Every structure is written in C-alpha cells, then in structure tokens.
Design a protein with these regions (language model features):
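Core catalytic lobe of class I
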Residues: 2-260
Length: 260
C-alpha cells in the first residue's frame, strides 16, 4: 500500500481508493493538491485563530491580509476537492472568521449557519475578567457552509440540452410543467432569481429527457439532523480528555452523528 501511494504521489493526483481511511501527513496545501476534484463529502477545519491563543504559531501572520491570503491558499484547494453535495465546518473566533467570509463565498460556498458550543465557565481558566472591555468568551464558534451546486447544475443541464438539440419549450412539455415565462426549466438553467436545485423527482425526469447518469446524491445536500438538537451545543465536555494542545477539540465534538 505504501509503495503504491508513493508511486501515485510521483504522478501527482492520488487515487481515492488508496487514501480512504488513511492519514496524510505533510504540508496541508501540498497534500490537498494531490486529492482528486470533487471527491470529498465533508471538510472539518480548525485553522490557527490568529492572535487569539498566546502561542507563537498563532502570531505567524503580521496583518489581517497576510492571514487571509494564507487561508485562501488551502481554501481554494478545498473548493476544488469538495463534492457539489459537500458540507464544510470551520472552527474559529467570529471576529477573525469575518475576515474570511467574503472570500469563502466567492469560492462557491453558501453560509448556512453559525453553531455555538458552550464550554462553560471553566473555560475562563481563572483569568481575571474584571478588566475586560467585553463579555468573557466561554463559547466555541463553528461556521457551517455547503457548496453551491447550482452554477454547476446550470452549466451541466444546458450542455446536455445543446448536445441533444432540445428547446426549453420541448423540455418543459416533457417535464409536464407550464411552458409560459420560461417554465420550470428556467429555474435550473436561466438567470432566475428563484434559481434552485431540482428535487429528486425532477432530477429523475431530467435524467430521462436529457439522457445522463449523474446520481442525485452527487448534486444535492443531505442533512441528518436529529430531533431536539439546535445550533447551540451545551453537552460537550472540553475538559474530560487529556489535553495535548491549547485548542484541542474533544472527540465527542468531532463525532457528532447529529450533524455530519
């Protein structure tokens, strides 16, 4: 296995069957470049917060622009490897995450939600908070994004339409949809402000009409949220496990079957 992976690395892009359930140890950006396009379902990121933790590694970037540029090096690769149906979670402090927001969205991600993890008063660690000029932070912030598959779907369907020589009117009729004002077809391929991802039922019809075999699971997000859970998590013990790193995340937090 190791020799096979080495050969793959010499040739560049790795084969997913060789790295599934494996840990890639190396420079993040370099290793990301070797992962195939649109092959990753879920990305969980915990980058340096930047000037939050009193450690040398959190002060490597002098300015906001330097930090943002570095983050975009690996975020650009992530936007390439994540599936159209993929999800992304990034840990951080809101006051620094906001520096990344615009760039992340421009890479094709859609902001879905902010998740707050309540770490409790113990997270203050005996610090003197009376001199603070803000409320003491006892939470962990996670931003949840999905990848915007609509532009890809639009281009893909329009190409199939062109290849088959079909008109929008013909497609709408075969879909059993209204044909005035562009019809339902324009929701997927036009410049419609109500642009949307087709339902699974509609996708099946489009497969038959446009003669393609692209599974619905490849273009549409699936959410496995358990009843009773919200975007505030207060059942995670940050102090039960042995801590080897100042921003270490508990195993339970990363094993959230409620979400990912």
């Amino acid at each position: 296995m190791e020799e096979q992976i080495k050969k793959q690395r010499i040739n560049g892009i790795l084969h997913m069957s060789d790295i599934l359930n494996q840990i890639l140890l190396g420079d993040c950006v370099k290793e990301l470049k070797r992962i195939p396009d649109r092959s990753i379902d879920l990305v969980i990121l915990d980058p340096p917060y930047w000037k939050i933790i009193n450690e040398r590694w959190d002060f490597e970037w002098r300015t906001k622009d330097e930090y943002t540029a570095w983050c975009m090096e690996w975020f650009t690769e992530i936007s390439r490897i994540i599936k159209l149906s993929g999800s992304l979670y990034i840990f951080g402090y809101t006051r620094n995450l906001v520096y990344l927001y615009r760039n992340i969205v421009e890479l094709g991600f859609v902001f879905r939600q902010e998740i707050i993890v309540d770490k409790g008063m113990r997270s203050l660690g005996g610090r003197k908070t009376s001199t603070y000029k803000m409320f003491p932070t006892v939470t962990e912030t996670i931003w949840f994004f999905t990848f915007n598959s609509k532009p890809y779907i639009k281009d893909f369907l329009r190409k199939r339409q062109k290849d088959l020589g079909l008109t929008a009117l013909e497609i709408n009729k075969r879909l059993g949809a209204k044909v005035n004002g562009g019809g339902v077809w324009s929701l997927y391929t036009g410049n419609n402000i109500l642009a949307q991802v087709p339902t699974e039922e509609m996708w099946t019809k489009l497969q038959e009409i446009l003669k393609f075999d692209l599974p619905y699971t490849e273009i549409s997000q699936t959410f496995n949220i358990e009843l009773g859970y919200t975007n505030v998590w207060s059942d995670i013990d940050f102090y039960k496990e042995k801590r080897l790193h100042k921003t270490q995340k508990p195993v339970k937090l990363l094993d959230q079957k409620r979400v990912w």
